Amino acid sequence: MSIFRITNILVSVLAVGFLLTGCVSKEKSAERLYQVLEKVVKAEKEFEEQQEPLVALEKEEKEIYNQIMALGMKQHEEIVKLSDDALSIIDKRRDHLQKEIDSINDSKTEFKKAEEIKNEIKDSAQKRKADDLFEIMRNRYKVHKQLAKEYSSALDSDKDLYLMLKNESISYDKLEAHVTRLNTTYQKVYDANEEFNELTAQYNEKKLEFYKEAGLNLEK
């Protein structure tokens, strides 16, 4: 019964600097929008900091699961000990997930301020670039919400799995059926992860395009 784990790190939005000296922005609102959009980056700093610890914990838990699968049921005491270790890791993963969610929510709050400024833009070319940018970010937030939901569901199923493994009388068929369902959930997590990273890459690209269209003198 192999178990599926995602090991991809979620990509964060990138900070971009520009030189105020010699800035040839067509509108002051572009400079104001820049300031707020870069606050969105800062709001996601904690989100970014959760990625490597989460992946490390996922790998650690996978190793524990493999150790359990290598043991016979006669070694029940060792299985219980390893399952408890895995349950502790699941709690840590849940803590990191909550910090990630909180950080994305802070990002949303800042982004709403940016939307108010965007609506003040008069230049049609800038407006088109900004509209594209904001549509991508709204989709990104939507995908992360779904991703977090699926990941939380996977954590619940992970917990159930190790509780089942601690039960000496659990049948192989029940374990196998549970692992199959769990892997289906993790496939959903993986798919949402991929979509989120793609949207983040698009957002970072469109943000640069907007800054250039607005005449902001970007730092190299």
What are these regions (language model features)?
Residues L19-G22:
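C-terminal motif of bacterial Sec signal peptides marking the signal peptidase cleavage site
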Residues S2-L10:
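Bacterial N-terminal signal peptides that target proteins for export
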Residues E100-L182, V189, E209-L216:
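Extended amphipathic alpha-helical interaction segments
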Residues E27, E31-Y34, E38-V41, K45, ...:
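Register-specific recognition of a single heptad position within extended alpha-helical repeats
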